[in-house]
Structure formats: C-alpha cells, structure tokens
C-alpha cells in the first residue's frame, strides 16, 4: 500500500494508504471471508511483487500463501470505504476474553493518553473463567508515581469494561530483541510465572 502526495494530510498520517497499481489487497476473517468495511481482519495481498514462497520450505509457504495466491501477512487491519487501510495490530497478539476479540494496540493507544505513562504493552494471560485476561505493563515518565487504582479509574467509562486491564504492573523497561523489538511473549510468560498459571491453559 502507499499514500500519494495529493492525498489529504489526515489520510497520510492515519493510514498505510491504498493498494498500489497491479496489486490486490483484502481484509479477511478467520474463515477467509472478506470482512465488512471498517471491520478488523487479516491483511492479505496478491500480485506481481508478492513473494512466491519461502526458499526450500514448502510447509511454511503453505502457511503464508493460500491456494488462490493470497499472502496472509499476520497483520490485523481495517479498510475504509475509500480503500485506505490501517494496521491495528498482529493476529498473534490478539486477546480473546470471554468471547470478545481485544486488540492490544487499541488499549495501548488509550493508555498513552495518561499523562504519567511513557510506554505501555498489553498482553493476554490465561484465565479460567474468561479464557484470557488483560495485563498491562506500564513504564512511567521519570519522577512520576502511579498505582493500579489510578489506571483503572482512568479507564472507567472510557473504554469497554472487558478491555480494562485486570493486571497492571509498573516496570522500568520491556524485554527486547537485539534489534529493539519488544518481545511480548516474554511479558506473557513472566506473568504466567508470577501468577502461577499453567502453560497448558494458554492453548
């Protein structure tokens, strides 16, 4: 996708643009059906610039590219009526709480509005009642003090009740790769250990 120089500024800064010439994109649900305009689903693309597959790895290729040639990116995205796409998260990061799909990025962007929050990461942890619960790891701005009750109060009435983090932890930083990418799975695993949850419950 791309934005054009003559696209409105609000489009250029709030989306990843529209499909490029001679390529196709679609947003699909878990069953491969195209979702309605504005609804989140997996971002798929097809065309001359899309890879043919993984070198010498037919199994991985079959996971990424379906029989009709669509490459499944693993990105969660929406598309508006004018064809502008917006990436809203990663499928592997999505939390399913009590049958509701919860997108961590949405909660993270909301919590960034809190004046004391410098950075935040949202993950799902196993829960016997709801399947998964929301957990927030929060890094505060220098010199700030905050507690779980303040975060909950900030969320009340502003986001859906099932999106409010049940667990809130204040941290100095996040586990990262050598290239600086945050490793959410390590946050999740740390919470599983702390809460005494069984890994089998995450399946």
Regions found by a protein language model. Name each.
Residues 1-23, 37-41, 50-52, 62, ...:
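Conserved ATP-binding loop and adjacent catalytic segment of the adenylate-forming AMP-binding
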Residues 6-7, 150-157, 195-198:
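Short, positively charged
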Residues 25, 31, 47-53, 60-63, ...:
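AMP-binding/adenylate-forming catalytic core of the ANL superfamily
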């Amino acid at each position: 996708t791309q934005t054009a120089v003559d696209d409105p500024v609000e489009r250029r800064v709030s989306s990843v643009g529209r499909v490029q010439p001679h390529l196709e994109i679609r947003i699909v649900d878990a069953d491969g059906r195209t979702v309605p305009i504005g609804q989140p689903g997996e971002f798929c693309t097809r065309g001359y610039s899309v890879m043919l597959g993984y070198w010498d790895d037919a199994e991985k290729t079959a996971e990424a590219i379906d029989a009709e040639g669509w490459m499944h990116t693993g990105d969660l995205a929406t598309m508006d009526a004018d064809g502008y796409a917006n990436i809203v998260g990663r499928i592997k990061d999505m939390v399913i709480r009590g049958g509701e799909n919860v997108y961590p990025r949405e909660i993270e962007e909301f919590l960034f509005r809190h004046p004391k929050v410098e950075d935040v990461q949202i993950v799902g942890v196993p829960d016997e009642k709801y399947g998964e619960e929301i957990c927030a790891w929060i890094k505060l701005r220098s010199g700030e003090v905050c507690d779980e009750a303040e975060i909950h109060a900030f969320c009340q009435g502003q986001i859906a009740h099932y999106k409010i983090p049940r667990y809130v932890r204040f941290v100095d930083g996040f586990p990262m790769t050598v290239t600086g990418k945050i490793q959410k799975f390590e946050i999740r695993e740390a919470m599983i250990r702390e809460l005494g949850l069984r890994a089998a419950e995450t399946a």
